[in-house]
């Protein structure tokens, strides 16, 4: 998969893949909590920063779990059809 090959060049991303789905999922949870905290506090810039981390880690999790953006698009289309 091209996306994973590109990501593996990044040492941090490579380490995440090495640690597996459970560790990546934990990281997604942490980033989600941090995003929510900043949103509730009204810290727009900090929320954007944390949301960026959340999206990044979610994309890594999807890849590690064998899912793709196309899978998400298909699910959303199914729900709204």
Segments predicted by a language model, with ranges:
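Residues that form generic nucleotide/phosphate-binding pockets
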Residues: 2, 15-19, 75, 79
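Short, small-residue-biased leader/transition segments that mark boundaries at the very start
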Residues: 3-8
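Alpha-helix initiation and N-capping motif
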Residues: 9-10, 69
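Active-site flanking loop/helix segments enriched in acidic
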Residues: 10-24, 39-43
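Surface-exposed loop/turn and secondary-structure junction residues enriched for glycine/proline
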Residues: 15, 19-20, 27, 51, ...
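An amphipathic alpha-helical micro-motif enriched in hydrophobic residues
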Residues: 28-36, 44-65
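C-terminal end-helix/capping segment
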Residues: 67-81
